[in-house]
Amino acid sequence: QPYVELGARARAADNENATSGLLYSIANRVSYVCGFTGPSLAVDTACSSSLTALHLACQSLHTGESDLALVGGVNLTMGETKSHFLAKNNFLSSDARCRSFGADGTGYVPGEGVATLVLQPLAAAQAEGRNIYGQILGSAINHGGKTNGYTVPNPKAQSALIQRALDKAGCAANRIDYVEAHGTGTELGDPIEINALTETFRGSGSSCAIGSVKSNIGHLEATAGLAGIIKVVMQM
C-alpha cells in the first residue's frame, strides 16, 4: 500500500514512528544516518522535482552553504490508484509504448527508478582527485503561469527558462548540439516543448538533436530529470 496511507493510519493510531512515512523523511533519514548537517529537504514540484532539487543544491554550493551535495530522486508505484487516475484522464499510452516526439505517440508510460548525483565545486573535486563525469555550468527554474489549463505547459515560459539557463552558463545556443528533453510522448506536451526549443534555437545557425530517456525506461516522474542527466553523461 502507498506509504502515505500507512503514515495516515499510523498517525491516527498515535504511532510515534508515523514520521518515517512522510515525504520529508526521505531526505532527512539520509542526513540522519550519514551525519550530514547541511540543508536537508524533500522537493515536490511534480515531474520537475529532481531537477528542482538539483538547482537548489547548486545554489547551496554557490553560496558556500554546502561544500558537497547529494541530489536524489525515487519513483515507485506502490498501488493501483494512480494508474486508474492516469488511465481515466487519458494520460497513458494506449499500447504501453512511450514514443517521445513520435507522430504516433498517444501518451506516457510510468516507470520506476532511483537516481542520485554527487555535486561538488569543480576546484574542490579536482583538488581531491574525484572522478568528474560532467559539469553544470548553469541552471534555472520557473513556472508557466496562467495557461489554457492547469497541466498545460507554456511554451513562452519554457523558452525563456532555457534562454536564462544558457545565459547563466555563459553558453550561446549555437554551441549546443544535443538537448535531453522532457518528451513524454503525449500529443499535448511534446509539440509545446518542440515550439519552446525552436523559439530558443531559432537563428542560432546550427542544428541540434533532441531525445528523451523516456522512450527507453518510461517516465520516472519525480525522478525523470536526474534519469535524463545520467543518460547524457553516460553517452558523452
Briefly describe each language-model feature range:
Residues Q1-M236:
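Condensing-enzyme catalytic core of the thiolase-fold
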